[in-house]
Amino acid sequence: MPRLRSLPLVATALVSAGLAVGCGSSSSAGDHSFTGDAYPNVDRASTRQVKSPIYSGNVNQLKKVWSIPIEGKGVYGSYASTPLIVNGVVYSQDLESNVEAIDLESGEVLWEKKYESPSHGPNGLAIAEGRVYGATSAEAFALRQGTGKELWTTPLNGAIDMAPGVNEGRVYVSTVPETPEGGYEAGAIGTLWAMDAKTGKKQWHFDTAPKGLWGHPEINSGGGLWYPPSFDKAGNVYAGTGNPAPLPGTSKYPWGSSRPGPNLYTNSMIKLDPDTGKLIWYYQETPHGIYDWDFQNSPIITKSGGREVAIGSGKGGFAVAVDVKTGEVVWRSHVGIHNGHDKDSLYAMRGEYDRIRTGRVEPGRLGGVIAPMASDEERVYTPIVNRSMTVKSGSAIAEGSADTGEVAALDLETGEILWEASFNSPIYGALLVVNDLVFATSGEGFIHALNVNSGSEVWGAKLPSGSNAGVMISGDMLVTGAGLPAAEGQMPKLVAYKLGG
């Protein structure tokens, strides 16, 4: 997963993609807590902003009302998604790809569908027109919303670690070039697939890296999506993509020299035609990525200074707003820790290896903006992991430790940092905005509710385990997963809170 500072590449281009067929009806799904483009299903713009009576004046009245065990277990804990809440039912997927429907008020499990297919995450679900969409580590699926009955499955050629996107009768799922152990699979390409939402039939695909893999398919791989795409009102598809590999390189091909050039369309934000899958434009944040700095988060589609923009972010520690019509940069802001390595991938692409300093690099390959942002009408909120890594040579990286976390608020029109809230633990989960609060979860197992104007903490709660999952709010209730055990004896659980208990 990559991202870095460089001279970003922005272009308008057309590329070959699979044939598009058919077009379904609108897929917005409603819930009493949602208005307009509200998360998750009708939040096509990925703002992660919801309507609720919860605000700073009553948030301290949230009390835990139920919790249930999370039984599945993946490579990185048990839970890494955001639960969905539709019409009083919570829909949840664990890191073994198992799906449950749970009564929001009581915590009673209404139905479950077992897959027992371990995922690295972040995975999760989407819901539209009476169907629950998800994926195992190898195939996309649809379940009947009321019963959990499987309606269709579609095998995809590659590993899957994401929640689907759904819009206008299509389901979008991407593969990533990953081995079961979590390494990079040589010769694999991350491919975004568009499928008919009713049948699962493939309609088109877009390869986020070329089939020739820059001349060395026996070594290289790259691309793919880790989070769902976003959609504008015309249905256009916006997605953030992952890194190329190997990284930083091999002993024979240090600093990514087995894959010369910028390695399109990795570490990028892409805009695709929804009917054909053809590329409209791309913005590449980190050409020739060598540090696993994905630009992976779902772009936020919103307005900045009177024009529509798409705001992307990733593990290199930058948030970038681009014009949705052209892909041209409107503003670009760094967040979190940086220690002078933002241009190393450019140096590597140019063969200027003497300009790359080995040693401690910030952010690390699991740092930066590792999970989706949220936005309201004035600000963009970024979850930050301040984690370093040690680059030993052009072919070796040692993982660092996750030291601290932050939430930073950026001015929507300028990208200027308005405030930063610091934590003793990484902020691994996606953010959520409701009224004058932004909610975050931490790796050590806390929910934090921050005032959107100042970043001051208004309310907090200890979870039964560490968390790398987002929260969801419906009406006067909040639900989140704690599935990242950080200490012996901690148990993964899905937890619900309610105003007044």
Predicted regions and their residues:
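Surface-exposed loop and turn segments in beta-propeller and other repeat-based domains
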Residues: 66-74, 115-118, 203-219, 279-292, ...
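A structural motif specific to WD40 beta-propellers
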Residues: 63-65, 108-112, 149-152, 203-205, ...
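Conserved blade-ending motifs and adjacent loop-strand segments that build the rim/top face
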Residues: 289-290, 339-342, 347-356, 422-429, ...
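C-terminal motif of bacterial Sec signal peptides marking the signal peptidase cleavage site
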Residues: 20-22
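Blade/loop signatures of beta-propeller domains
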Residues: 29-65, 396-397
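Short loop/turn segments that connect beta-strands within beta-propeller blades
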Residues: 103-106, 144-147, 196-199, 274-276, ...
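Repeat-blade elements of multi-bladed beta-propeller folds
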Residues: 31-42, 76-98, 117-140, 160-192, ...
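Bacterial signal peptide processing site
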Residues: 24-26
